[in-house]
Amino acid sequence: MTWVLFDYGGVICEPQSEADRARLARASGGPAADFEASYWRYRLDYDRAALDVTAYWQRVAADLGRSYSDPEIAELSRLDSTSWLTLQPGTVELITGLAAAGHRLAVLSNAPADVAEAVHALPVAGYFEHLVFSCALKSAKPDPECFQATLALLRAEPADVIFLDDRRDNVAAAAVLGMVSFQFTEAPAARADLARHGIAAG
């Protein structure tokens, strides 16, 4: 049976809003542009659990000439997780329709443990048989190992998986392994892409 494998950030949830990024920058105590650069500089290592929450935020702090207290790290982590929880209504509608039609659904997302925990608590998480996060795999997209570990969890061959992700490099990496892959732009286009492969939402 075919699996529909969704990315989370930028697909199920909205990208971080300007307001959320501004709140994070203010909490960081540094200039917004410098904070933004440092936030992403170490993100992949944070996503794949090479850095824990304290090590990640202290790396960011060091770039800004600061050192964060435990309460400051807790607040930054809270703001960070919250910034990834605004769902895209069209995608949620697509997910509920696919689930109602009996399709098997899973998530593969690059995310640190705090964000993954927050996503698991969302009602939409209940539609997925598996929620797979890079922090648990200790490997992140677009690394082939990340996809291969996910296929093993799904007990699926690449040809049995349709993958949707907003990042072109992740889509390309999945395609190399043999998955049917689409770059996500908006829910109606994703619905049409899936329908062309015989996956219709109820």
Over which residues does each language-model region extend?
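Short, flexible loop segments at the rims of nucleotide/cofactor-binding pockets, characterized by
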Residues: 81-86, 109-110, 139
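Hydrophobic residues in well-ordered beta-strands that form the structural core
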Residues: 14, 107-109, 183
